[in-house]
Amino acid sequence: MRCIFVLDILNGAVVHALRGERRSYRPITEFSRLVSTSEPLGLLGELRPQEVYVADLNLITGKGDNLKAIGEISGMAKTMADIGISRLTDLDRLPPKVSPVLGTETASLSLIEEAAAKLAQHGSRALVSIDMKKGRLLAADPGLAGQDPISLLKSLNHLDLEGVILLDLERVGASTGLDTVFLNAAAEASRHPLILGGGIKGEEDLEALEEMGFAGALLATAVHNGRIPLSKIQ
């Protein structure tokens, strides 16, 4: 089970994400029991995770970027990043060695297909993030709006992807636990390695995910509050 540490970065600082309510995000030091800094490199130096997922909240919301920091982060840990990709040329903005995450909140299905094909030509692959809120798909593509996430998972099966992230923003930072009915259906529907983001509250959830066949989990809150040992991400 891949335990991937999450860095939500806004205006150069790591913030505590809660239920996708971005206006209320606060520096991670106001929440964490573990870190003394919200500066990304300093935080990584303290926690030493092997693998990280970075959400560049500035790029996702169209207000600046944290690309320099992402490049530096990739020198300290294996890195995947969501930079709000909405055009094929956005792939070129990512620093080398960083795996692109194509989130449905900003990327259309046609863009996801084009990006997967382009990356395959260069021997690399992207991850797709199925972005949801309260179980409903968040989609920039009008053609995806209202589509069932399980149906979308099936429609991605023909693509050459590194994996698919299931990210329900309503569960992010909330330690709500697992929707086992949905997750079992997702595991059955997808041919790709699946990674869950949002809601994981402790080690028992990681064990349940592994039993369902998930490849990994995005972790932040449960690490910062001590419910999941730091050793899991190191």
Model regions and ranges:
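Hydrophobic faces of well-ordered beta-strands that scaffold small-molecule active sites
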Residues: 2-9, 52-54, 79-83, 100-102, ...
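Short, acidic/polar
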Residues: 32-45, 88-92, 144-155, 206
